[in-house]
Amino acid sequence: MQSQNTPAAGRYPAGGLAFPHRDLTGIGQLARHEILYLLDEAEQWVELNRQSQKTTDLLNGLTIINAFFENSTRTLLSFEIAGKRLGADVVNMHAATSSVKKGETLIDTAMTLNAMRADAIVIRHASSGAVRLIAEKVDCPVLNAGDGQHEHPTQALLDALTMRHAMKLPAGSDLNGLKVTICGDILHSRVARSNILSLTALGAEVRVCAPPALMPAEIEAMGVTPFHDFDAALKGANIVMMLRLQQERMSGQFIPSPREYRHLYGLTPERLARAEADAFVMHPGPMNRGIEIDSTVADHPTRSLITRQVEMGVAIRMACLEVLTRRARRTPGWEAEGASA
């Protein structure tokens, strides 16, 4: 990796105010300096979460609704912990117990959520674009916790923060020169899309690897190098990010068999040796051990960053909630914030 401490040109000043977005619906809406701003805002929460006293009252009196229309464990738990550590009242709404199961439309749901006068709504939905639609119908900030095959912005942010910590880069640093290989179901993965957007914006060299049937046709237009040969994609990589096969989004037969997929695209200790000697391994979860990643790799004591990703996820989500609720809290400078989606 070269140029490990590239300064963040055009970054907001220390304690900067003007984060111009009311909502966070995707990485695609953010400029490079805005991504860096959120990463840097998360640093204070990384430190707080490592203390015995992990809570603050910054969001005291505010209500956050986690509206999850798609099953989730780690993302929902991460957002719930983030909100509670900031002092907010957090309410979780699960699709299985919601009126959506009874035929309520998404617009009706949005109107209902808006009438509850929440101060922020976190949404996860199986349909691409659903989060943006709800954001257009409510009066409070909306955070995208994953929508269909579109985006998962906080996952990309936590992944970038994890990489920055693993490479021992200080606050304000981008990822210029970092070589990142992402392997798995690129076609159906919102995590891949959001990571590609954030990593290329931060200066990383991104390679994506997948079987031909799981590689988007237009992927090179996103500024990445596509591979179908995993061994070739690993050469020189500093970070190897594995993605699971998203069987729930597949309508046909995309791979011959799990066994054949593991043979060609599974990350084993032998295959990891083709990357840089000190390369790190990441996975957004949930993992399919023995298919896209071996347990010996996933659980490696020094090279696996998987549990650190979970740790950084809480800090990133605390940062996003704190920044997007400044308007509701009348934090100094809030007038300059929340102007656009």
UniProtKB/Swiss-Prot annotation:
Keywords: Pyrimidine biosynthesis, Transferase. It catalyses: carbamoyl phosphate + L-aspartate = N-carbamoyl-L-aspartate + phosphate + H(+). One of its GO terms (cellular component) is cytosol. InterPro entries: Asp/Orn_carbamoyltranf_P-bd, Asp/Orn_carbamoylTrfase, Asp/Orn_carbamoylTrfase_sf, Asp_carbamoyltransf, Asp_carbamoyltransf_Asp/Orn-bd. Disulfide bonds: none annotated. Its EC number is 2.1.3.2. Carbamoyl phosphate binds at R74, T75, R124, H152, Q155, G285, P286. One of its GO terms (biological process) is 'de novo' pyrimidine nucleobase biosynthetic process. One of its GO terms (molecular function) is amino acid binding. Heterododecamer (2C3:3R2) of six catalytic PyrB chains organized as two trimers (C3), and six regulatory PyrI chains organized as three dimers (R2). Belongs to the aspartate/ornithine carbamoyltransferase superfamily. ATCase family. NCBIfam families: asp_carb_tr, PRK00856.1. Catalyzes the condensation of carbamoyl phosphate and aspartate to form carbamoyl aspartate and inorganic phosphate, the committed step in the de novo pyrimidine nucleotide biosynthesis pathway. PANTHER family: ASPARTATE CARBAMOYLTRANSFERASE (PTHR45753:SF6), ORNITHINE CARBAMOYLTRANSFERASE, MITOCHONDRIAL (PTHR45753). This is Aspartate carbamoyltransferase catalytic subunit. It comes from Novosphingobium aromaticivorans (strain ATCC 700278 / DSM 12444 / CCUG 56034 / CIP 105152 / NBRC 16084 / F199). The gene is pyrB.
